[in-house]
């Protein structure tokens, strides 16, 4: 039995419809329709772009509740903090000419 993805359907409405969502994601309109109807599962890697496109009105957690987004969000936060720290450290060493 196919399960309609109501959250993705709502996301499409927020951005102006299925065709608009297809353009935003760089996919075909039939793909968007299949993801809504549950013919094919919405790929998890599309969820962050959808969340951004809806300006947070539809969250990744709503689009794919089977994925532990809180873990991924924490990991991404830690990675960004590490990158900023590495950047700061490299900047300090490039200016430290004593």
Swiss-Prot record:
Molecular functions (GO terms): DNA binding
Domain of life: Bacteria
UniProt miscellaneous comment: Encoded in the Rac prophage region.
Description of the deletion phenotype: The toxic effects of racR silencing can be observed in the ydaS deletion mutant (where YdaT levels are elevated), but the ydaS-ydaT double deletion mutant shows complete attenuation of the toxic effects of racR silencing.
Induction summary: Not expressed under normal physiological conditions. Expression is repressed by the transcriptional repressor RacR.
InterPro entries found in the cross-reference section: Cro/C1-type_HTH (IPR001387), Lambda_DNA-bd_dom_sf (IPR010982), YdaS_toxin-like (IPR031856)
Function according to Swiss-Prot or TrEMBL: When overexpressed, it induces Rac prophage excision, possibly to counteract the lethal toxicity of YdaT. Overexpression of ydaS or ydaST reduces growth and leads to loss of cell viability. May contribute to toxicity and morphological defects.
Alphabetically ordered keywords of this record: Transcription, Transcription regulation
Protein name stated in the entry: Putative transcriptional regulator YdaS
Provenance organism: Escherichia coli (strain K12)
Pfam families: YdaS_toxin (PF15943)
Encoding gene, per UniProt annotation: ydaS
């Amino acid at each position: 039995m196919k399960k309609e993805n109501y959250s993705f359907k709502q996301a499409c409405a927020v951005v102006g419809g299925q065709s608009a969502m297809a353009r935003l994601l760089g996919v075909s309109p039939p793909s968007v329709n299949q993801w809504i109807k549950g013919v094919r599962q919405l790929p998890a890697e599309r969820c962050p772009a959808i969340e951004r496109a809806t300006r947070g009105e539809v969250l990744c957690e709503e689009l794919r509740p089977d994925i532990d987004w809180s873990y991924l969000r924490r990991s991404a936060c830690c990675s960004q903090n590490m990158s900023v720290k590495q950047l700061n450290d490299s900047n300090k060493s490039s200016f430290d000419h004593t």
